[in-house]
Curated annotation (Swiss-Prot):
Belongs to the TrpC family. Pfam families: IGPS. It comes from the Bacteria. CDD domains: IGPS. Its EC number is 4.1.1.48. Keywords: Amino-acid biosynthesis, Aromatic amino acid biosynthesis, Decarboxylase, Lyase, Tryptophan biosynthesis. It catalyses: 1-(2-carboxyphenylamino)-1-deoxy-D-ribulose 5-phosphate + H(+) = (1S,2R)-1-C-(indol-3-yl)glycerol 3-phosphate + CO2 + H2O. Pathway: Amino-acid biosynthesis; L-tryptophan biosynthesis; L-tryptophan from chorismate: step 4/5. PROSITE patterns: IGPS (PS00614). This is Indole-3-glycerol phosphate synthase.
Length: 252
């Protein structure tokens, strides 16, 4: 699936027409993760659909969802901007950024410098770079470009070999372990436990995918994760406000 998405992304890049720079002020994604509202930082995802599950939320209203997440004391937001596979839009990110005070991550499949420029212009505070989608040197170049634009970078990896290849080139400030197996699409938070041993001291570790209950939060925290990225389990609920409270075992 990842290869299919990347192939499509290569085609779409050729059609990108950069929009006017919205000049929205940058917020520090990393600082928000390091000063969380709870025992582990929450990056709450604004996500309409996925390739495996189809439409997750009918009547999708990104700004309303983002405001509920903010009210529920999420630390950062992640907004899907990929259209063909996730039914996302750049405008969703810009609208969300204008409506809340939280840092916003652009969740997309970034493989080219024009996408980094685009992320900056639409108001992203951080971008996602996927280790399995890029050669380590290319990833480093895009990483540096984003940092020069004032954005943070979440470097996501699924497997040990990918992470080791990246660490041979440079040490990212933020590493996300995606708990989804790219071969069978199953998720296990045990992947965070295995990968945490490879993450250098001083790097912020995020656990992503397959997190749906408070026990998962406690488990990945004990493994060394300082933050979690949660999307589908929150988006499936009718109220994202209540969904966040439920995830943390709180009374909303």
């Amino acid at each position: 699936m990842l290869n299919q998405i990347i192939d499509r992304k290569r085609e779409d890049i050729l059609k990108i027409k950069l929009s006017e720079d919205l000049k929205l002020p940058k917020r520090s994604f990393k600082k928000a993760l390091l000063s969380p509202n709870r025992f582990v930082a929450l990056i709450a995802e604004v996500k309409k659909a996925s390739p495996s599950k189809g439409v997750i939320q009918e009547g999708f209203e990104p700004v309303k969802i983002a405001k509920q997440y903010e009210q529920a004391k999420a630390d950062c937001l992640s907004v899907l901007t990929d259209t063909p596979f996730f039914q996302g839009k750049n405008s969703y990110l810009s609208d969300v950024k204008r409506s809340v005070s939280l840092p916003v991550l652009r969740k997309d499949f970034i493989i080219d410098s024009i996408q980094v420029e685009e992320a900056d212009r639409i108001g992203a505070d951080a971008i996602l770079l996927i280790g399995e989608a890029l050669e380590p040197q290319k990833l480093f170049e895009l990483y540096q470009q984003a940092v020069e634009k004032g954005m943070d970078v979440l470097v996501e990896v699924h497997g040990e070999e990918t992470l080791e290849g990246i660490l041979n080139v440079f040490t990212p400030e933020i590493i996300g372990v995606n708990n989804r197996n790219l071969k069978n699409f199953e998720t296990t938070v045990g992947q965070t436990e295995r990968m945490a041993k490879l993450v250098p001291p001083g790097t912020v570790l995020i656990s992503e995918s397959g997190i749906g209950k408070s026990e998962d939060l406690t488990f990945v925290k004990t493994c060394g994760a300082q933050a979690v990225l949660v999307g589908e389990s929150l988006m499936r609920e009718t109220s994202q406000l209540k969904a966040v409270y439920a995830l943390f075992g709180e009374d909303g």
